[in-house]
Amino acid sequence: MAQSAERPRPYAFMTANATRPVRTRFAPSPTGFLHLGGARTALFSWAFARHHQGVFVLRIEDTDVERSTPEAVQAILDSMDWLGMQPDEGPFYQMKRMDRYAEVLAGMLEAGTAYHCYCSPEEVDAMREAARAKGLKPRYDGTWRPEPGKTLPPVPADRKPVIRFRNPIDGATSWNDMVKGPISFDNGELDDLIIARPDGTPTYNFCVVVDDWDMGITHVLRGDDHVNNTPRQINILRALGATLPEYGHVPMILGPDGEKLSKRHGAVNVMEYDAQGYLPEAMVNYLARLGWSHGDDELFTREQLVEWFDTRHLSKSASQWDPKKLNWVNAHYIKGMDDAELAGRVAPRVERRGGKPQAADLPAIMGLLKDRAETLEQLAEDAMLFCGEYQPAPAELAAQHLTETARAALADFAARARDTEWNRAAISALIKAVLADRGLKMPQLGIPLRVAVTGRAQTPAVDAVLELLGKETVLARLQAL
């Protein structure tokens, strides 16, 4: 498993011109399940690291103490494990790194790149309102920002300060985004960010910077809702004398209606797709194709994803979630899976339905059913025909199909079947013989056979169904008519 020490090993940053080993990270907040957008971001970071023989780091950003839960952490770990994205290092927990953040904050205060601000929230709100009234961008006005020759206000005796980062005023902060291309922010538009609260706890943007610095992160792939955070984080990294990572911001995933993907579009929790019977191989394939492409290839293995992955082929526009396309991809992986392996994945789902997969030839059943299935849940439900308790046909269905003519043909079939070898070819030949001798067409015997033996009018090929049920079971059910 991954390295789990809470303080990563020191990382020796190289010069900007030197080649650094690739180190990516996924840094979720454990305030709920891992959603599809987060899973896709993690997948891109994982694939990029694997492609470059680099290191994929998992960091748990758990500083929101009220909302972060151990259950949410476990849900994230379970989701990543299910998708096959095991980290090389971590998980690291921000709450266990508070001493390190305090150390860096103290150093910044000493260096003059951060300062104490004693403004109350109400005073800052008033500053912003005053700026709006003048048609300016609402922001903190720098009251407590140290400047040469500036006299600061008296320190209030009854107020604990926040710590603000002394953001550059002149110039611009720019980077060449791996997804969006060149992006630039005027430093004059960025106010002095709060990096520690009055109780001393560090804020999100500060923790992220220190973590990326300490962990030697070279490439940051994340959602484009973080674009506005990036210039602030870059400026803090520069103030610390750190080598900057490269940044890439991936557009969001939209629902089928073009709106932001949400619960109203269906499942957004990764593990719900496991419960619904989607294969992790299919989810990885489909998620990767949402916002990344390799020519016209729609289907590819995890190994091919790693081999082909390139940030130059990440889309600049939002991707649209398509449940039908996911079903198509999942069906492809189900059809291509070895019958025995597929049986192993379906067996627990059959058992949850009260079936007995061990009492049937489940691999052979998978071979019969898998070409029609889109999910493992559908396979498990269909397999209950062979593994579940037999339910005779409802009276209405029996009355419709088990006529006197049908019952006579079924009795003839049963009598001949006793001395017939029990395999699909022999059963098919027997059905044809009964049809020919009685002048019947296939539906006149095939449907009554299904209804009598399975309790259903629709099943896969009747000869295959009878073979898998076994001669003894088939004859016993026909005898009971």
UniProtKB/Swiss-Prot annotation:
Short motif ('HIGH' region): ranges: 28-38
Motif position, 'KMSKS' region: 260-264
InterPro entries referenced in this protein's UniProt entry, alphabetically: aa-tRNA-synth_I_cd-bd, aa-tRNA-synth_I_codon-bd_sub2, aa-tRNA-synth_I_CS, aa_tRNA-synth_I_cd-bd_sf, Glu-tRNA-ligase_bac/mito, Glu/Gln-tRNA-synth, Glu/Gln-tRNA-synth_Ib_cat-dom, GluQ/Sye
Keywords, comma-separated and alphabetical: Aminoacyl-tRNA synthetase, ATP-binding, Cytoplasm, Ligase, Nucleotide-binding, Protein biosynthesis
GO biological process, one term: glutamyl-tRNA aminoacylation
GO molecular function annotation: ATP binding; glutamate-tRNA ligase activity; tRNA binding; zinc ion binding
One term under GO cellular component: cytosol
Localization, UniProt: Cytoplasm
EC numbers for this chain: 6.1.1.17
Residues given in the record as ATP binding sites: 263
Ranges of biased composition (kind: Basic and acidic residues): 139-148
One Pfam family hit: tRNA-synt_1c
The protein, known as: Glutamate--tRNA ligase
Species name: Bordetella bronchiseptica (strain ATCC BAA-588 / NCTC 13252 / RB50)
Source taxonomy: Bacteria, Pseudomonadati, Pseudomonadota, Betaproteobacteria, Burkholderiales
